[in-house]
Design a protein with these regions (language model features):
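Short, flexible coil/linker elements and helix-boundary hinge sites characteristic
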Residues: 9-10, 31, 128-129
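Juxtamembrane/interface motifs at transmembrane-helix termini
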Residues: 73, 127-129, 177-179
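Membrane-embedded helix bundles of polyisoprenyl
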Residues: 17-30, 35-124, 137-159
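Periplasmic/ER-lumenal interhelical loops and adjacent helix-loop junctions
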Residues: 148, 153-197
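Hydrophobic, small-residue-rich membrane helices and short re-entrant helix-turn-helix hairpins
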Residues: 128-136
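Membrane-interface coil-to-helix junctions
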Residues: 1-23, 42-65, 177-197
Length: 197
């Protein structure tokens, strides 16, 4: 499947092209006019942040972000009552590619966006009495997520296992003795934040 991505180009231009195509498809599906879709597409794909992370070598992060609109496209197709098989296929393939790149921080935050959109759809469906449609669409999304998790499970499990031996140390969400941070493990906070932008 990843060979398909190389049609877009395995270099930096491929990331931008993928971002352009995915965002344009999403905005058209959302009902935007062509000029608005073109403007939104360029605003997303050609933002300064995209070029900063590519230039800084965060190519995996850029690829993961490029596929976010395509995942949302699959969800939108289900909500807009398009072909369920095609919508599930788009959602599953896009989510597979998104997770395949392995930038789990982006996936983590993107999951919050997807959950917020799903909760909005859930409330809307329950208010309008579309329970059967809600169950079918939820099932389609769940099947897609399960397929993607199973296909990526070796990578996800190995990442989890290696994370147990990370130099980043223990979670900051643990109890602190006398209100002071435990400096016996992990990176110094100043060092870690120096790499954030």
């Amino acid at each position: 499947m990843t060979k398909v991505l190389y049609i877009l180009g395995d270099k930096d231009g491929g990331i931008v092209l993928c971002s352009l195509l995915c965002m344009y498809a999403l905005l058209i599906m959302l009902g935007c006019s062509i000029p608005v879709a073109v403007f939104g597409t360029f605003a997303f794909a050609l933002s300064s942040y995209s070029f900063i992370i590519i230039a800084a070598g965060h190519v995996i992060k850029a690829w993961a972000m490029a596929f976010m609109p395509l995942v949302l496209l699959g969800m939108t197709m289900l909500v807009k009552k398009k072909n369920k098989f095609l919508a599930t296929l788009v959602f599953t393939v896009a989510l597979y590619w998104h997770i395949l790149f392995g930038h789990y921080q982006i996936t983590y935050y993107f999951a919050f966006l997807c959950l917020a959109l799903y909760l909005g759809y859930l409330i809307y469906s329950l208010k309008n009495g579309e329970k059967k449609e809600l169950l079918v669409n939820s099932g389609c999304l769940l099947v897609g997520v399960l397929i993607v998790v199973l296909m990526n499970s070796p990578k996800l499990v190995s990442n989890y296992e290696l994370g147990q031996h990370s130099i980043r140390g223990k979670s900051e969400l643990t109890a602190q003795v006398d209100g002071k941070a435990d400096k016996s493990s992990g990176l110094d906070q100043g060092y870690a934040f120096a790499w954030s932008y």
